[in-house]
């Protein structure tokens, strides 16, 4: 018994054309033979979906099917269709973006591969916050694929030439299947090149490129942030087909600092101050990330975890002459291990301030 066409596409009767197209598109992408080579079950599902789509997308055929079911097409050429299967290729006109690569043997992919640059490479380097502040120069060692010095990317030994592929006769593509169900794919022997290397270059083993280890200088600019990347043009792998090199992307990882915490252009640090400094205020000296000594004023009566902003003492802003701020967060230290004189002073201060033994929690 033949399956219901709506059921094959996962639709209910009365589905719109857009719904039919979307349902077929989803199945076709998943089960197309070019993506499931050698998988007979996938080919069968794709064939069923195509038959269902061919009927349900056509208003006349759909009307007949809705009224009479499969019997409306008994005796026809395509699985019993009265109209035959004259327009198989027309089915895919609305899906050119998907099926162009399937039905042209991935010509677009072959063309892109031959004209694309070589692969990009990635490299991670860890630096200190001071390195990020001042900028940093360092040599890094990389391994990449460069053009073979012997064959210059031609892949054959000197004095020899590639041979025409005998599987695809130089087209780079082969046709699979028969009758209406034919799919063109990339030749598995020459990988779409249309030619094979009968006498491969001994230096690169017919690949057209060789592995090379080299040392290059990396210039890290002042103000760079964590996880930012530096692009080094042409320092990736080579594509031997066109001798174009990819790029190297160096990712910057900044180590945590024991004093300063970074947030973009600004730096944060704890500022430990005494009880008296907090109460009376005081001018103090501190060192910045640049090891520069500066003076700051602690305001009278400052509370714990309040901020003091030092403008221009933060990180350099990348590719500018501007700087962020240094934000100091106060941490008031409670005195411990007091001697007798200090104890008397605090007792007198407590009396002067009229510290009682009752605390109102609402006055925090």
Swiss-Prot record:
<dbReference type="Pfam" id="PF00684">
    <property type="entry name" value="DnaJ_CXXCXGXG"/>
</dbReference>
<feature type="binding site">
    <location>
        <position position="187"/>
    </location>
    <ligand>
        <name>Zn(2+) 2</name>
    </ligand>
</feature>
<protein>
    <recommendedName>
        <fullName>Chaperone protein DnaJ</fullName>
    </recommendedName>
</protein>
<keyword id="KW-0963">Cytoplasm</keyword>
<comment type="subunit">
    <text>Homodimer.</text>
</comment>
<feature type="binding site">
    <location>
        <position position="165"/>
    </location>
    <ligand>
        <name>Zn(2+) 2</name>
    </ligand>
</feature>
<dbReference type="InterPro" id="IPR036410">
    <property type="entry name" value="HSP_DnaJ_Cys-rich_dom_sf"/>
</dbReference>
<dbReference type="GO" id="GO:0051085">
    <property type="term" value="P:chaperone cofactor-dependent protein refolding"/>
</dbReference>
<dbReference type="GO" id="GO:0009408">
    <property type="term" value="P:response to heat"/>
</dbReference>
<dbReference type="Pfam" id="PF01556">
    <property type="entry name" value="DnaJ_C"/>
</dbReference>
<comment type="function">
    <text>Participates actively in the response to hyperosmotic and heat shock by preventing the aggregation of stress-denatured proteins and by disaggregating proteins, also in an autonomous, DnaK-independent fashion. Unfolded proteins bind initially to DnaJ; upon interaction with the DnaJ-bound protein, DnaK hydrolyzes its bound ATP, resulting in the formation of a stable complex. GrpE releases ADP from DnaK; ATP binding to DnaK triggers the release of the substrate protein, thus completing the reaction cycle.</text>
</comment>
<feature type="binding site">
    <location>
        <position position="204"/>
    </location>
    <ligand>
        <name>Zn(2+) 1</name>
    </ligand>
</feature>
<keyword id="KW-0479">Metal-binding</keyword>
<keyword id="KW-0143">Chaperone</keyword>
<feature type="binding site">
    <location>
        <position position="168"/>
    </location>
    <ligand>
        <name>Zn(2+) 2</name>
    </ligand>
</feature>
<dbReference type="InterPro" id="IPR001305">
    <property type="entry name" value="HSP_DnaJ_Cys-rich_dom"/>
</dbReference>
<comment type="similarity">
    <text>Belongs to the DnaJ family.</text>
</comment>
<feature type="zinc finger region" description="CR-type">
    <location>
        <begin position="135"/>
        <end position="213"/>
    </location>
</feature>
<feature type="binding site">
    <location>
        <position position="148"/>
    </location>
    <ligand>
        <name>Zn(2+) 1</name>
    </ligand>
</feature>
<keyword id="KW-0677">Repeat</keyword>
<feature type="domain" description="J">
    <location>
        <begin position="4"/>
        <end position="69"/>
    </location>
</feature>
<dbReference type="InterPro" id="IPR036869">
    <property type="entry name" value="J_dom_sf"/>
</dbReference>
<keyword id="KW-0235">DNA replication</keyword>
<feature type="repeat" description="CXXCXGXG motif">
    <location>
        <begin position="165"/>
        <end position="172"/>
    </location>
</feature>
<feature type="repeat" description="CXXCXGXG motif">
    <location>
        <begin position="148"/>
        <end position="155"/>
    </location>
</feature>
<feature type="binding site">
    <location>
        <position position="190"/>
    </location>
    <ligand>
        <name>Zn(2+) 2</name>
    </ligand>
</feature>
<feature type="repeat" description="CXXCXGXG motif">
    <location>
        <begin position="187"/>
        <end position="194"/>
    </location>
</feature>
<feature type="binding site">
    <location>
        <position position="151"/>
    </location>
    <ligand>
        <name>Zn(2+) 1</name>
    </ligand>
</feature>
<dbReference type="InterPro" id="IPR001623">
    <property type="entry name" value="DnaJ_domain"/>
</dbReference>
<dbReference type="InterPro" id="IPR002939">
    <property type="entry name" value="DnaJ_C"/>
</dbReference>
<dbReference type="InterPro" id="IPR012724">
    <property type="entry name" value="DnaJ"/>
</dbReference>
<dbReference type="GO" id="GO:0051082">
    <property type="term" value="F:unfolded protein binding"/>
</dbReference>
<feature type="repeat" description="CXXCXGXG motif">
    <location>
        <begin position="201"/>
        <end position="208"/>
    </location>
</feature>
<dbReference type="GO" id="GO:0005737">
    <property type="term" value="C:cytoplasm"/>
</dbReference>
<dbReference type="InterPro" id="IPR008971">
    <property type="entry name" value="HSP40/DnaJ_pept-bd"/>
</dbReference>
<dbReference type="GO" id="GO:0031072">
    <property type="term" value="F:heat shock protein binding"/>
</dbReference>
<dbReference type="Pfam" id="PF00226">
    <property type="entry name" value="DnaJ"/>
</dbReference>
<dbReference type="GO" id="GO:0006260">
    <property type="term" value="P:DNA replication"/>
</dbReference>
<dbReference type="InterPro" id="IPR018253">
    <property type="entry name" value="DnaJ_domain_CS"/>
</dbReference>
<dbReference type="GO" id="GO:0005524">
    <property type="term" value="F:ATP binding"/>
</dbReference>
<feature type="binding site">
    <location>
        <position position="201"/>
    </location>
    <ligand>
        <name>Zn(2+) 1</name>
    </ligand>
</feature>
<keyword id="KW-0863">Zinc-finger</keyword>
């Amino acid at each position: 018994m033949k399956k219901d066409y709506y059921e094959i596409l996962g639709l209910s009767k009365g589905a719109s054309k857009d719904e039919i197209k979307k349902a077929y598109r989803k199945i076709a992408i998943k089960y197309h033979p070019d993506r499931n080579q050698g998988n007979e079950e996938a080919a069968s599902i794709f064939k069923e979906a195509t038959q269902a789509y061919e009927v349900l997308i056509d208003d006349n055929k759909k009307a007949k099917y809705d009224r009479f079911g499969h019997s409306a097409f008994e005796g026809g050429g395509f699985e019993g269709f009265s109209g035959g299967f004259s327009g198989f290729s027309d089915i895919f006109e609305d899906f050119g973006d998907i099926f162009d690569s399937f039905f042209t043997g991935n010509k677009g992919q072959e063309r892109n591969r031959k004209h694309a640059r070589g692969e990009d490479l990635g490299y991670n380097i860890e630096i200190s916050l001071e390195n990020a502040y001042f900028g940093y120069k360092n040599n890094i060692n990389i391994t990449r694929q460069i053009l073979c010095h012997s064959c210059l990317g031609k892949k054959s030994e000197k004095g020899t030439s590639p041979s025409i592929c005998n599987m695809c006769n130089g087209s780079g593509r082969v046709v699979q299947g028969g009758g209406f169900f034919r799919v063109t794919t990339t030749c598995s022997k020459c990988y779409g090149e249309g030619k094979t290397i009968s006498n491969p270059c001994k230096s690169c083993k017919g690949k057209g490129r060789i592995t090379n280890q080299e040392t290059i200088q990396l210039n890290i600019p002042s103000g760079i942030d964590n996880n930012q990347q530096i692009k080094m043009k042409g320092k990736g792998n080579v594509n031997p087909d066109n001798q174009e090199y990819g790029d190297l992307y160096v990712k910057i990882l900044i180590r945590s600092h024991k004093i300063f915490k970074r947030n973009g252009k600004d730096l944060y640090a704890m500022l430990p101050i005494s009880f008296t400094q907090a109460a009376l205020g005081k001018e103090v000296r501190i060192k910045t990330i640049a090891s520069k000594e500066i003076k700051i004023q602690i305001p009278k009566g400052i509370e714990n975890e309040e901020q003091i902003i030092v403008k221009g003492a933060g990180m350099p802003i990348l590719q500018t002459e501007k700087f962020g701020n240094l934000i100091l967060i106060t941490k008031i230290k409670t005195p411990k291990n007091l001697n007798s004189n200090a104890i008397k002073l605090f007792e007198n201060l407590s009396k002067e301030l009229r510290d009682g033994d009752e605390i109102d929690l609402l006055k925090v």
